[in-house]
Design a protein with these regions (language model features):
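Extracellular loop-to-transmembrane helix junctions
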Residues: 31-50, 54, 108-138, 148, ...
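Flexible loop linkers connecting adjacent transmembrane helices
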Residues: 54-81, 107, 117, 121, ...
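Extracellular/periplasmic helix-exit of transmembrane alpha-helices
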Residues: 298-314, 369-453, 489, 534-539
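Membrane-interface helix-loop-helix modules in multi-pass membrane proteins
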Residues: 22-28, 33, 79-142, 153-157, ...
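Loop-to-transmembrane helix boundary motifs in multi-pass membrane proteins
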Residues: 154-172, 366-373, 444-446, 465-475, ...
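Membrane-interface "cap" regions at the ends of multi-pass membrane proteins
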Residues: 1-14, 47-102, 284, 324, ...
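Membrane-interface loop-to-helix entry segments
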Residues: 35-42, 47, 53-60, 166, ...
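Transmembrane helix-loop junctions in multi-pass membrane proteins
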Residues: 18-31, 102, 114, 172-188, ...
């Protein structure tokens, strides 16, 4: 195609995207078709990748396809493996796409679809994809080192240790929140619990099958795995209806917490080939297939967005989460726009599989755009269901039905209708019956809400194939595998971080080949995130109300730290005139996270500030005037949880400010130098047989 044809295509895409965005923005008081959001998003992603992504690659970073990558230099068939770019894109996407893009947009829908949509699109183009791409580039130029090691190398040992401690603490919070979403989705859900539990022996069987029974037969084991997944969902319905079997899979939140802690420990110490690898394989199939199916379903059904563009809760008084649109919308959406967790994947893991530096934009920038598209579809799925149902599902039980309420559903319908979102008890009963659950009231965490939206889209787009309950539990399985994959991998990664830290005290604890050291570090990791998980599960306000803001703040602060590193590297490369590419999102993230952190810690508003909330409940205990919706032990739990969250938030704020000072100091020192001071691996040209090596690796995959 000649240049004029290409220009015509990009011009047409720009016009279509601008028209779609304009239609969405100018539509006031009328319900619009969800297809407008999907079209606008796709146009934005394509234009951003073609122009901004490639500008960063060619002009800002000076990506060099002739430069040897760590995967080619150290090709050992284990950690360093040059991988075909399409295969690596799948690996990278599976690793970064966890619960964030699924849950964050669902929670953000409390304020309407418009604010969330704008930030998801603007945030990913200017911040999220930029971070993923630049960190991948920086790590690739330094032999695939991890984020903490990169900070240590470029900013000094003190900053490096501080970054490592912060990374570990943030990882613990992330894992606790991820696990809590699974717990909230599976509590008193025999169908969902059975289906997810079924995947554990299935994954182990697949691992043994491919390693010992039929080595190399990937096709066979894939068919077996997919067939058994469908059987797990169908048989889950039989289990849920059985008075004998249902109680075996009907657990409280606390029981599921301890089950997940035990599972997390076992999964982290078992050989990777036995459980994690086959589960990841199953998860990748399910992720990609479901995302594609959901996108096609939206195109076929063209559902109407029933949630308003802006709700009354933009003033910060919402029941799902508290706080004003700025800064709390930005930390609530989290991974759908920008995620610090991705920096841990883009450094240390993906760089060791990158076959050519020229593919970093496709993997890093493109992979994050794909995750953002998942977030857009999650937002659509949440906004097509009745707003009354949305708020009944996501509001805390203490708000919907105070302690002692006999008819919880009637109470919830009355409370939600009082907010201006009319809903009847019959409607809530009907939806619970259609999805095969005992109740949908206060199923906080976002995952059940997303599952309801997905179920109706998939059921409708396939012409009523299977009933809604099948698709609801299919969506729950999809979300649980999405999340448990991240919990498995995250626990293992956190164990490596902790062993690095423990190695400072005792060098023997750093050895990953030592079984006692591995078991000790793994136990400490699962107990750490298990503790926060338990605190969230027993929280009378649902846990998500307090833990998700902490997760959002910590995760976005980690992104800010990663982008600070990228800005420092640009200064040390003598490319400071382009440092704005990293400094622009860094500045916004620091403003948002520090503002949110300060408000969550010290705001006198008893719906926002952790300490204010703790003091309010402590005063109730001291005076003996305990509201009917709480018990004294519940109030004591809330006091402790909020004080702990405040302490952690203050710690993360101090860390990010200190690292910002180290960044400024390092950048100023770099400006005084006449030559580049970035500590890159010396240049080596790509070998002549690089393509052959990659092709061999592709066949091995």
């Amino acid at each position: 195609m000649n240049n004029s044809g290409k220009y015509l295509i990009w011009t047409l895409l720009s016009v279509i995207g601008a028209f779609a965005l304009g239609y969405i923005a100018l539509n006031r008081g009328e319900q619009i078709n969800a297809l407008w959001i999907v079209v606008a998003a796709v146009c934005v992603y394509l234009i951003a990748y073609r122009f901004y992504g490639l500008y960063i690659a060619k002009t800002v970073l000076g990506v060099d396809p002739t430069r040897m990558t760590p995967a080619v230099r150290h090709n050992d068939g284990l950690d360093y493996v040059p991988t075909d770019k399409k295969v690596l894109f799948g690996h990278h996407f599976a690793a970064i796409a966890g619960a964030g893009p699924l849950v964050g947009p669902v929670l953000a829908a409390q304020m309407g679809y418009l604010p969330g949509m704008i930030w998801i699109l603007a945030g990913v183009v200017l911040a999220g994809a930029v971070q993923d791409f630049m960190v991948l580039f920086v790590s690739t130029r330094r032999d695939g080192r991890s984020l903490g090691e990169l900070v240590k190398e470029e900013m000094g040992p003190t900053a490096g240790v501080l970054a490592l401690v912060a990374c570990f603490m943030i990882m613990v919070i992330i894992l606790a929140v991820l696990a809590m979403i699974v717990v909230k989705a599976l509590t008193h859900s025999p169908w969902g619990t059975y289906t997810v539990a079924f995947t554990i022996p299935l994954a182990i069987f697949m691992g043994i099958y491919i390693r010992y029974l039929r080595p190399g037969r990937i096709g066979e084991v894939s068919v077996i795995g997919l067939v058994m997944l469908v059987f797990a969902i169908i048989s889950g319905g039989w289990v849920a209806e059985s008075p004998t079997w249902a109680p075996w899979f009907d657990y409280t939140g606390v029981q599921l917490t301890w089950i997940l802690v035990g599972y997390g420990f076992v999964a982290a110490v078992l050989p990777v080939w036995l459980l994690l690898a086959p589960r990841d394989y199953l998860s990748t199939f399910l992720k990609i297939g479901t995302i594609v199916g959901l996108a096609i379903g939206i195109l076929i059904m063209r559902p109407t967005l029933t949630m308003p563009a802006l709700t009354k809760f933009v003033d910060g008084t919402g029941p799902v989460w508290s706080g004003n649109l700025f800064p709390f919308l930005f930390i609530t959406i989290a991974c759908g726009a920008v995620s610090g967790f991705h920096a841990l994947i883009s450094s240390g893991t993906t760089p060791k599989m990158l076959a050519n530096e020229g593919q970093a934009c496709f993997i890093g920038y493109g992979g994050m755009l794909m995750e953002s598209f998942v977030a857009i579809m999650a937002l659509v799925a949440a906004c097509i269901i009745d707003p009354g149902v949305y708020f009944a599902m996501n509001s805390p039980m203490a708000v919907l039905a105070p302690a002692g309420t006999t008819d919880v559903v009637a109470s919830a319908a009355q409370v939600v209708s009082g907010w201006g979102f009319s809903i009847t008890p019959d409607t809530l009963h009907q939806i619970a019956s259609e999805v095969g659950e005992q109740s949908i009231i206060s199923r906080a965490g976002g995952a059940p809400t997303l599952a309801v939206g997905m179920a109706y889209i998939l059921h409708g787009s396939l012409g009523g194939l299977m009933d809604v309950s099948f698709w609801y539990h299919f969506a729950i399985l999809f979300e649980a595998l999405f999340i448990l994959t991240a919990v498995d991998a995250g626990t293992r990664a956190a164990r490596f971080m902790l062993q690095d830290l423990l190695g400072v005290i005792s060098p023997g604890l750093k050895k990953t080949s030592s079984l006692p050291a591995n078991l000790l570090a793994t136990a400490l990791c699962v107990l750490a995130w298990g503790y926060f998980l338990h605190q969230g599960v027993v929280d009378p306000l649902g846990g998500i109300n307090t833990l998700w803001p902490l997760f959002g703040i910590a995760n976005q602060m980690l992104a800010g730290m990663a982008l600070m590193l990228c800005a420092v590297v640009l200064f040390k490369m003598k490319r400071q005139r382009y440092a704005w590419v990293a400094l622009l999102p860094t500045s916004w993230l620091l403003i948002c996270t520090l503002t949110a952190g300060w408000q969550k810690s010290f705001s006198p508003d008893t719906k926002v500030g952790f300490l204010a909330i703790a003091n309010k409940f402590q005063a109730m205990i001291d005076s003996g005037s305990i509201p009917p919706q709480y018990t004294e032990s519940q109030l004591a739990q809330l006091v402790f949880n909020n004080r702990l969250d405040a302490g952690l938030t203050i710690f993360f704020m101090i860390v990010v400010v200190v690292l910002a000072l180290f960044s400024i100091k390092t950048a100023l020192a770099a400006l005084k130098e006449d030559k580049p001071t970035a500590k890159e691996t010396p240049y080596q040209a790509m070998p002549a047989d690089a393509q052959t090596i990659t092709a061999q690796a592709k066949r091995a995959h």
